Swiss-Prot record:
Keywords linked to the UniProt accession: Eukaryotic host gene expression shutoff by virus, Host cytoplasm, Host gene expression shutoff by virus, Host mRNA suppression by virus, Host nucleus, Host-virus interaction, Inhibition of host innate immune response by virus, Inhibition of host interferon signaling pathway by virus, Inhibition of host PKR by virus, Inhibition of host pre-mRNA processing by virus, Inhibition of host RIG-I by virus, Inhibition of host RLR pathway by virus, Interferon antiviral system evasion, RNA-binding, Ubl conjugation, Viral immunoevasion
Organism: Influenza A virus (strain A/Wilson-Smith/1933 H1N1) (Influenza A virus (strain A/WS/1933 H1N1))
Sequence motif: Nuclear localization signal, positions: 34-38
Protein name, entry field: Non-structural protein 1
Family that this chain belongs to: Belongs to the influenza A viruses NS1 family.
GO molecular-function terms, A-Z: protein serine/threonine kinase inhibitor activity; RNA binding
Localization, UniProt: Host nucleus; Host cytoplasm
Length: 230
């Protein structure tokens, strides 16, 4: 196993522990707590894949961080922080919408790279909006936290989420997954639109009808229906 993979996991475990302590002292806001829950699932998946114990990895990560901090001067830390572009966290969904449990009468699921697409194929003839919570860096989608499809009544009928065992994805991964989800929902005569915020930062554009400019590849996925894909 690559030692850098192990040390990265160890440091991530320790930093999650520090953030958990911050949350326990009620010092974290809603986006902070949201990322904390998502990262916990990701760490569990990575630990299972790597065959590493999270508690043991957390202790090892603490030693790595302490060693680095001893070697790091305040001036070097300031320079490092100044050179790293700052990311922003954008929310279409409330914390309640993100954490709400939902059920599918006709569940369908597809793994598309590092993302999992789920939808209820029993939903027909509805107006649906796709909302997402994600981080942005340099005015471009950086990391998708969660995307969900809502009817006008507020019912959740679809979802795109990162796979805990496969951390890391690109904005192209997200756009491809959105194309597949739209195709599946439209197969049952639903009308689907994407939130203006997600359009702006994933596609760098915004259409009044809520439809992003999908690539020919994504359009083929839509035309081919989702029955064989999700």
């Amino acid at each position: 196993m690559d030692p850098n993979t192990v040390s990265s996991f160890q440091v991530d475990c320790f930093l999650w522990h520090v953030r958990k302590r911050v949350a326990d002292q009620e010092l974290g806001d809603a986006p902070f707590l949201d990322r904390l829950r998502r990262d916990q699932k990701s760490l569990r998946g990575r630990g299972s894949t790597l065959g590493l114990d999270i508690e043991t990895a957390t202790r090892a990560g603490k030693q790595i961080v302490e060693r680095i901090l001893k070697e790091e001067s305040d001036e070097a830390l300031k320079m490092t922080m100044a050179s790293v572009p700052a990311s922003r966290y954008l929310t279409d969904m409330t914390l309640e919408e993100m954490s709400r449990h939902w059920f599918m009468l006709m569940p369908k699921q597809k793994v598309a790279g590092p993302l999992c697409i789920r939808m209820d194929q029993a939903i027909m003839d509805k107006n649906i909006i796709l909302k997402a919570n994600f981080s942005v860096i340099l005015d471009r989608l950086e990391t998708l936290i969660l995307l969900r499809a809502f009817t006008e009544e507020g019912t959740i009928v679809g979802e795109i989420s990162p796979l805990p065992s496969l951390p890391g994805h690109t904005d192209e991964d997200v756009k491809n997954a959105v194309g597949v989800l739209i195709g599946g929902l439209e197969w049952n005569n639903n009308t689907v639109r994407v939130s203006e915020t997600l359009q702006r930062f994933a596609w760098r554009s915004s259409n009044e009808n809520g439809r992003p400019p999908l690539t020919p590849k994504q359009k083929r996925k839509m035309a081919g229906t989702i029955r064989s894909e999700v």
